[in-house]
From Swiss-Prot:
Recorded coiled-coil stretches: none
General function of this protein: Non catalytic polymerase cofactor and regulatory protein that plays a role in viral transcription and replication. Stabilizes the RNA polymerase L to the N-RNA template and binds the soluble protein N, preventing it from encapsidating non-genomic RNA. Also inhibits host IFN-alpha and IFN-beta signaling by binding and retaining phosphorylated STAT1 in the cytoplasm or by inhibiting the DNA binding of STAT1 in the nucleus.
Keyword Ligase: no
Region of interest: Disordered: 61-80, 144-192
Biased composition (Polar residues): 156-180
Molecular function GO labels: RNA-directed RNA polymerase activity
Gene behind the chain: P
Protein name: Phosphoprotein
Stated family: Belongs to the lyssavirus protein P family.
Length: 298
């Protein structure tokens, strides 16, 4: 039987390794106990507590869960209040206006006139808004009812006309109250009763100058051109509108030349949004009054 000889130094190193392993195990156990002291109910020694420690509180789990659900519900309601970019119709409008602005800059760099560029841009913007932002049905019905009420009031006023015994001054005041027109225009001259021949004369003179452009004062202290074609209205509707201008029916009955620029300005200021944006209303009233006085003086 062979004998195995063990070196004493190897035994000593093995014992040292065992002692180190035991110390390592003891250290690991101590660290585990320290880290799990809060689970065993052992108080933890803290040298310095945070300043906001008083604000900490222990709440019931169910109560905290209810509060969290309530806060989430409120956040959901806030999100419902705001529309997303796909739902907000003003987002594409802003993009469209940015594109129009870039187009205006490019045209101005090529040397085109500013008033021409601006007039076209305004027309495009108005058309875009009218197409993408239609008026509500309730508003249209309210406008129709208001217009019907005004027509009934005018019919009642015309049926209760003053007698012949009243003076001419009272007739003039009544006609000036019933007639309509832009502010600043003097309605002292009254219209006489018209018939088919008067409407035919008015329509004839307007048709002859339907595409002729007239100068009007603009908001930018300049002028711009406008004609009857840009009203996008039927000739019969234009004739009915201009009959409300004082003196027009009398001049048409006498076969006189009519103040077409005054008539165009009156109709456009009431029925054209683009014209309302471009024109200087104060200067327009004075211009129409001057034209009317000049034609009535002949």
């Amino acid at each position: 039987m062979s004998k195995i000889f063990v070196n004493p130094s190897a035994l000593r190193s093995g014992l040292a390794d065992l002692e180190m392993a035991e110390e390592t195990v003891d250290l690991v156990n101590k660290n585990m106990e320290d880290s799990q002291a809060h689970l065993q109910g052992i108080p933890i020694d803290v040298e310095t507590l945070p300043e906001d420690i008083k604000r900490l509180r222990i709440a019931d789990y169910k109560q905290g869960q209810q509060e969290e659900d309530a806060s989430r519900q409120e956040e959901g309601e806030d999100e419902d209040f705001y529309m997303t970019e796909s739902e907000n119709s003003y987002v594409p409008l802003q993009s469209y206006l940015d594109a129009v602005g870039m187009q205006i800059v490019r045209k101005m760099k090529t040397g085109d006139g500013f008033f021409k560029i601006w007039a076209q841009a305004v027309e495009d913007i108005v058309s875009y808004v009218a197409t993408n932002f239609p008026a509500p049905v309730n508003k249209l019905q309210a406008d129709k009812s208001t217009r019907t009420t005004l027509e009934k009031v005018k019919q009642a006023a015309s049926s209760s006309a003053p007698s012949k015994r009243e003076g001419p001054s009272s007739n003039m005041n009544l006609d000036s109250q019933e007639s309509s027109g832009p502010p600043g225009l003097d309605w002292a001259a009254s219209n006489d009763e018209d018939d088919g021949s008067i409407e035919a004369e008015i329509a004839h003179q307007i048709a002859e100058s339907f595409s002729k452009k007239y100068k009007f004062p603009s908001r930018s202290s300049g002028i711009f051109l406008w004609n009857f074609e840009q009203l996008k209205m039927n000739l019969d509707d234009i004739v009915r509108e201009v009959k409300g201008i004082p003196g027009v029916t009398r001049m048409a009955r006498d076969g006189m030349k009519l103040p077409l620029r005054c008539m165009l300005g009156s109709v456009a200021s009431n029925h054209s949004k683009r014209f309302q944006i471009l024109v200087n209303s104060a200067k327009l009233g004075k211009l129409m009054q001057d034209d009317l006085n000049r034609y009535l003086a002949y």
